Amino acid sequence: MSEKRRDNKGRILKTGESQRKDGRYLYKYIDSFGEPQFVYSWKLVATDRVPAGKRDCISLREKIAELQKDIHDGIDVVGKKMTLCQLYAKQNAQRPKVRKNTETGRKYLMDILKKDKLGVRSIDSIKPSDAKEWAIRMSENGYAYQTINNYKRSLKASFYIAIQDDCVRKNPFDFQLKAVLDDDTVPKTVLTEEQEEKLLAFAKADKTYSKNYDEILILLKTGLRISEFGGLTLPDLDFENRLVNIDHQLLRDTEIGYYIETPKTKSGERQVPMVEEAYQAFKRVLANRKNDKRVEIDGYSDFLFLNRKNYPKVASDYNGMMKGLVKKYNKYNEDKLPHITPHSLRHTFCTNYANAGMNPKALQYIMGHANIAMTLNYYAHATFDSAMAEMKRLNKEKQQERLVA
């Protein structure tokens, strides 16, 4: 009968266990790929003390028990050791054909993970507390609440892949961010009717911004996304039927420059009606066009709104213009205008029609929303005045019904 192996304390070692000359314990096993793997610890059992100068650690027998539980539960003991960066890369590789801005967003998050200590951690070692600490670090580094929430959602999706692949049991990013950080997201600006009138009147009369009056008016009266607006070309306008055809958007990237994208969803492809004010504004835009050299971008030309270099304007151009316009207005007027962006004008358009009682499905179509919930959120932007007006309208209709009856 062969003699049992013992450690330097005379304790019998089990199958696969051994002790190195430096006193460290080792456990050898064969993984699912038939490759030998090793687990180490300075302690055989939990009650052991680590040698002087060595960091405390989990005992070998505890590690073996955890390993055997993983194997019993079907956990991939090799896969669970991949880093968070590797897991995120794996998720992205499963969906390689994405839009340019999605690709850019992925790159930003990967760069963040590579610089953060969480990125090199094995996924099996990441706990909910680690994920929450990551969110706090992101906030301390100046990232906005919504940006952190978007990145957290991506990492949560990555861990669902790891769970499906039996690499881990739980998702450390499955928590509410608002329980960790205060939501400092600034509410989207909705212009009141009075603010809308003052903005348009000031732009129309101002020597610098009068050239932008029709652009602002069209945005307020069509609710277009700024990328859709910037991508408008002459063939997109149907004056006979008073429609604006939307089937593409114009974007600009710091690396590749201008490019055309199709709408993110099929709902983005639509025909937006021209109300009279928008119709007349488009007519003025065409009448004021100069016969300059026209650029072509991905097969599209005859863009309606050009900058001084005859390139089509994009979101950054309009953000800068609106910022300057509001700043100038507020300099000369006591009744200040709020911070306004091109999206504020789209938000105002949708809210106005929601408060006017437009059928939600009709408004969803005009806005190009993929989900009706997005549209219904605008119906929640009612003010006390609009709520009171709506109650009066409904009461008046009821009274008229009674009189008819």
From Swiss-Prot:
Keywords in alphabetical order: DNA integration, DNA recombination, DNA-binding, Transposable element, Viral genome integration, Virus entry into host cell
Kindly indicate whether the keyword Nucleotide-binding belongs to this entry: no
SUPFAM superfamilies, per database record: DNA breaking-rejoining enzymes, DNA-binding domain
Q: Which CDD domains match?
A: INT_ICEBs1_C_like
Q: Which Pfam families match?
A: Integrase_DNA, Phage_integrase
**Which residues does the entry assign to the active site, renumbered to this chain?**
R225, K264, H343, R346, H369, Y379 (o-(3'-phospho-dna)-tyrosine intermediate)
Q: Name one GO molecular function term.
A: integrase activity
> What processes does the entry annotate via GO biological process terms?
DNA recombination; establishment of integrated proviral latency; symbiont entry into host cell; viral genome integration into host DNA
List residues of the Tyr recombinase domain.
Answer: 186-392
InterPro entries given in the database record: CB, DNA-bd_dom_sf, DNA_brk_join_enz, Integrase-like_cat_sf, Integrase_catalytic, Integrase_recombinase_N, Integrase_Tn916-type_DNA-bd_N, Tyrosine_recombinase_XerCD
Limits of the Core-binding (CB) domain: 79-163
Q: Which family does it belong to?
A: Belongs to the 'phage' integrase family.
Any idea what this protein is called? Transposase from transposon Tn1545
The record lists the organism as Streptococcus agalactiae serotype V (strain ATCC BAA-611 / 2603 V/R)
